[in-house]
UniProtKB/Swiss-Prot annotation:
Species per Swiss-Prot/TrEMBL record: Rotavirus A (isolate RVA/Equine/United Kingdom/H2/1976/G3P4[12]) (RV-A)
Taxonomy, superkingdom: Viruses
A biological-process GO annotation: fusion of virus membrane with host plasma membrane
One Pfam family named in its UniProt record: Rota_Capsid_VP6
Record's protein name: Intermediate capsid protein VP6
Role: Intermediate capsid protein that self assembles to form an icosahedral capsid with a T=13 symmetry, which consists of 230 trimers of VP6, with channels at each of its five-fold vertices. This capsid constitutes the middle concentric layer of the viral mature particle. The innermost VP2 capsid and the intermediate VP6 capsid remain intact following cell entry to protect the dsRNA from degradation and to prevent unfavorable antiviral responses in the host cell during all the replication cycle of the virus.
Annotated residues for binding of Zn(2+): 153
Binding site for Ca(2+): 266, 286
Main location: virion
């Protein structure tokens, strides 16, 4: 893997810097590095493809070296270099695609394609120039089972989940109380609602709670917490749990009271915040517990317009609603996760779809992330680490 990264890095630098008019002295070190790559690859043969619709291609390396000059690089020099660069880039692209479409239930962190296995040979180690990539570093840690942490800016840790629970219900569905939520990616939105606006609740207050268990532990998380759930702030028709009827939800938004958020690890509270919004920090957690209240305003605090919205008896045409939004902006995870700010999952999925790669023993059809993270396993983690690393290498050359 580190050889593939070095190839890609060298080719990227060469494509960017070996241009007509450049002083040779400014790129002499790069050209020496480029020539070392050519010397190492010359005389070798590789084969890529042969899975799904990815065509089989044979690669033979027999290229001349770039010479020295005391002057600027001229058009002939650059054209010679460009021909070599283009062939090498095409080769790296195909090696990456060949690797991205393969998977294995055992030792999925190791190269799976014949071409990358061959590049892992000792004689190609002379190509190693710069392995400072975060992906390469973490791939090596995972390969040696020495992982200490993998950083993502916005980890897609929540499988998609959109549903509701009713704490009070009737066949007519005209006086409901309960909770509805939408969890996806790195965001939770949850709303508590009461058609009667807590008219008969103790102290005219309804208590709501939403608990989310993560599939992997997160640490050092920067989180945004807002006293609103905008996705549940407009009218909608909702299917009943048994699918036999529908009910009408017409929210009027209140600000939540007595908001408390707990971050737990193995059942123990690690961080606890009360009535605090904006940016918060969670140190170490695998479970999030959100609790909040809907409080009916005292009659003397209601203007006539507000009192008309929430009568003391049915029918209840407007439904008191409170909500919260929790968004993980950044966190460290000891497992490999898709990241909202990166394109690795999209790159891997696109290549697998483009070449009609058959469903293998590890990944779900279409690389469905909700399925993948819901049933996350060590085998999936190993394979994800490998294909994401290859995707990051490919993205250096292929946009």
């Amino acid at each position: 893997m580190d050889v593939l990264y070095s190839l890609s890095k060298t080719l990227k630098d060469a494509r960017d810097k070996i241009v007509e008019g450049t002083l040779y002295s400014n790129v002499s070190d790069l050209i020496q590095q480029f020539n070392q790559m050519v010397i190492t690859m010359n005389g070798n043969e590789f084969q890529t493809g042969g899975i799904g619709n990815l065509p089989i291609r044979n690669w033979n390396f027999d290229f001349g070296l770039l010479g020295t000059t005391l002057l600027n690089l001229d058009a002939n020099y650059v054209e010679t270099a460009r021909n070599t660069i283009d062939y090498f880039v095409d080769f790296v692209d195909n090696v990456c695609m060949d690797e991205m479409v393969r998977e294995s239930q055992r030792n999925g962190i190791a190269p799976q394609s014949d071409s990358l296995r061959k590049l892992s040979g000792i004689k190609f180690k002379r190509i190693n120039f710069d392995n400072s990539s975060e992906y390469i570093e973490n791939w090596n840690l995972q390969n040696r089972r020495q992982r200490k942490g993998f950083t993502f800016h916005k980890p897609n840790i929540f499988p998609y989940s959109a549903s509701f629970t009713l704490n009070r219900s009737q066949p007519a569905h005209d006086n409901l109380m309960g909770t509805m939520w939408l969890n996806a990616g790195s965001e939770i939105q949850v709303a508590g609602f009461d058609y009667s606006c807590a008219i008969n609740a103790p102290a005219n207050t309804q208590q709501f709670e939403h608990i989310v268990q993560l599939r992997r532990v997160l640490t050092t998380a920067t989180i945004t917490l807002l006293p609103d759930a905008e996705r549940f702030s407009f009218p909608r028709v909702i299917n009943s749990a048994d699918g036999t009827t529908t009910w009408y939800f017409n929210p009027v938004i209140f600000r939540p009271n007595n908001v408390e958020i707990e971050f737990l690890l193995n059942g123990q509270i690690i961080n606890n915040y009360q009535a605090r919004f904006g940016t918060i920090i969670a140190r170490n957690f695998d479970t999030i517990r959100l609790s909040f209240q809907l409080m009916r305003p005292p009659p003397q605090n209601m203007t006539p317009a507000v009192a008309a919205l929430f009568p003391n008896a049915p029918p209840f045409e407007h439904h008191a609603t409170v909500g919260l939004t929790l968004r993980i902006e950044s966190a460290i995870c000891e497992s490999v996760l898709a990241d909202a700010s990166e394109t690795m999952l999209a790159n891997v999925t696109s290549v697998r779809q483009e070449y009609a790669v058959p469903v293998g023993p590890v990944f779900p059809p279409g690389m469905n992330w909700t399925d993948l993270i819901t049933n996350y396993s060590p085998s999936r983690e190993d394979n994800l680490q490998r294909v994401f690393t290859v995707a990051s290498i490919r993205s250096m050359l292929i946009k």
